[in-house]
Amino acid sequence: RVSIPSVSKEHNRANAIFSRMGYVNFTDDETIWDDNDDDETIWDNSTESTKPSDEFFRVVGGEDAKPGQFPWQVLLNGETEAFCGGSIVNEKWIVTAAHCILPGIKIEVVAGKHNIEKKEDTEQRRNVTQIILHHSYNASFNKYSHDIALLELDKPLSLNSYVTPICIANREYTNIFLKFGAGYVSGWGKLFSQGRTASILQYLRVPLVDRATCLRSTKFTIYNNMFCAGFHEGGRDSCQGDSGGPHVTEVEGTNFLTGIISWGEECAMKGKYGIYTKVSRYVNW
């Protein structure tokens, strides 16, 4: 269950938005996953079941975020280094990409982070006690299909202006919000393909790409649980190390989770796009 923290004005605004749209509450279903979402349908005329190679972890051309600008963003640390991003669902749970989770890995979640090269008063560190991969996720079949996972923290986060859950709408409205056309992605991933990672949290506004254009851009399979976003001319994109981080859509001043950074071919290449997990498929959570 996703609680509505009293400290978060964003969630109150979200309920007001839904009221105007004829929908009063959001994300109050007790189930972890939507059992009706096993659709492996391939977009349009794509027929290959080719898998991207392991190097495609999937913010190039982005801007430095201000402290607290993306308070739902978290950093995932392994035993030796940071490796992925994620989003705060509530005080005890984080959502990220399933492909970030390697067998036996010990994960530390860092919330309230801005500059990863400095110890900051705003940061909160928690260990992960439980990992839940989507029940249809099968890395041996396709590492990026149903690319979504939940992480349970060992103790609750203390919510404040630097550590705040992202709003999650119901399936219908999450899909509608995605189609608004552009969303924000953020992370500490590589600043250019094969380059160095960012010290300060980066963000970028990326346009949604229609299915036909996306299919023409790649030889790899694009399922209905994925969507494409980015720029045809290249130069701006999510990149290695950003995986698991949020794609959010702003609606009347409130930010909603609409995607999860998943994969791509290199980073910011002309004619190539970032591929994201479509959150609307998984919100009965």
UniProtKB/Swiss-Prot annotation:
Where is the PTM Sulfotyrosine found along the chain?
23
Its domain of life reads Eukaryota
- Give a Pfam family name: Trypsin
Catalytic class of the enzyme: hydrolase
* Keywords per UniProt: Blood coagulation, Calcium, Disulfide bond, Glycoprotein, Hemostasis, Hydrolase, Metal-binding, Phosphoprotein, Protease, Secreted, Serine protease, Sulfation
Q: Give the record's GO biological process terms.
A: blood coagulation; proteolysis; zymogen activation
Quote the protein name from its UniProt record: Coagulation factor IX
Query: According to the UniProt record, which cysteines are disulfide-bonded?
Result: 84-100, 214-228, 239-267
Ligand binding (Ca(2+)) = 115, 120, 123
Catalytic site:
99 (charge relay system), 147 (charge relay system), 243 (charge relay system)
Q: Where is this site: Cleavage?
A: 13-14, 58-59
State the EC number(s): 3.4.21.22
Q: How is it modified after translation?
A: Activated by factor XIa, which excises the activation peptide. The propeptide can also be removed by snake venom protease. Activated by coagulation factor VIIa-tissue factor (F7-F3) complex in calcium-dependent manner.
Residues modified as Phosphothreonine: 27
UniProt GO cellular component terms: extracellular space
Location of the Peptidase S1 domain: 59-285
Q: State the oligomer form and interacting partners.
A: Heterodimer of a light chain and a heavy chain; disulfide-linked. Interacts (inactive and activated) with F11 (activated) in calcium-dependent manner. Interacts with SERPINC1.
Where in or outside the cell it occurs: the entry states:
Secreted
Entry's Gene Ontology molecular function annotations: calcium ion binding; endopeptidase activity; serine-type endopeptidase activity
Matching SUPFAM superfamilies: Trypsin-like serine proteases
Species of origin reads: Cavia porcellus (Guinea pig)
The record's listing under Gene3D superfamilies reads: Trypsin-like serine proteases
> Which InterPro entries does the record associate with it?
Peptidase_S1_PA, Peptidase_S1_PA_chymotrypsin, Peptidase_S1A, Serine_Proteases_S1, Trypsin_dom, TRYPSIN_HIS, TRYPSIN_SER
